[in-house]
Amino acid sequence: MSVISMKQLLEAGVHFGHQTRRWNPKMKKYIFVERNGIYIIDLQKTVKKLEEAYDFMRQVGQDGGKVLFVGTKKQAQEAIKDEAERSGNYYINQRWLGGTLTNFGTIQKRVARMKQIEKMEEEGTFEVLPKKEVIQLKKEHERLIKFLGGIRDMHDLPDVMFVVDPRKERIAVAEARKLNIPLVGIVDTNCDPDEIDYVIPANDDAIRAVKLLTAKMADALIESKQGEEEAPAVEAAAE
């Protein structure tokens, strides 16, 4: 059974690429036709590539791997957070802080600081501090949560990065590549597919398209866990 139907892709507008003047020639093999100055993505290829990415993600989940979902553009922020949380993984959906992966130790210190402020509040330290200092601490915490809340429990580098729009997230992509972290991505007609290991050629600007495809990646990870849960039950029944 197919991971996704052509109808679902069409309804979500996955086939709409960018204007023809804004394209990367390397995406030519994924383009079906040009219509009214816009490239239309070949959805048969999207289905095939999505299935490859799905199988890879499912294997990652089966191996106990962790995925960092990255998408900081407005159209991706909600889906990135929701689907990462739904599948028990990590996310960055605001600004990518340079060095998030390549300077991981420093980022971990910022996460520790975030948790320290939370502990101070829980233990009642805020009640004995000057009001001005408490306001500053709360502002600092808000900022840390905004940028690092999605990786607060990420104690090691991720096994895989899933990215929406590698062109926009080029710093994140460069860091992952430098560290040999495999990349899965929603790649529109203006992106360079060579930077991504598992390319999903698709519209990266429509909220519905981004949500649909990001959810499929989360589904693959969840499915891998369900398989693990079902296995002991099957073994018990066989005894």
UniProtKB/Swiss-Prot annotation:
GO (cellular component) term, any one: cytosolic small ribosomal subunit
Listed PROSITE patterns: RIBOSOMAL_S2_1, RIBOSOMAL_S2_2
Record InterPro entries: Ribosomal_uS2, Ribosomal_uS2_bac/mit/plastid, Ribosomal_uS2_CS, Ribosomal_uS2_flav_dom_sf
An annotated Gene Ontology molecular function: structural constituent of ribosome
Keyword Transferase found: no
Gene3D superfamilies reported in the protein's UniProt record: Glucose-6-phosphate isomerase like protein, domain 1, Helix hairpin bin
A UniProt-annotated Pfam family: Ribosomal_S2
One annotated GO biological process: translation
Source organism, top-level taxon: Bacteria
This protein's UniProt keywords: Ribonucleoprotein, Ribosomal protein
HAMAP family per UniProt: Ribosomal_uS2_B (MF_00291_B)
Similarity comment: Belongs to the universal ribosomal protein uS2 family.
Name of the protein in question: Small ribosomal subunit protein uS2
Provenance organism: Lysinibacillus sphaericus (strain C3-41)
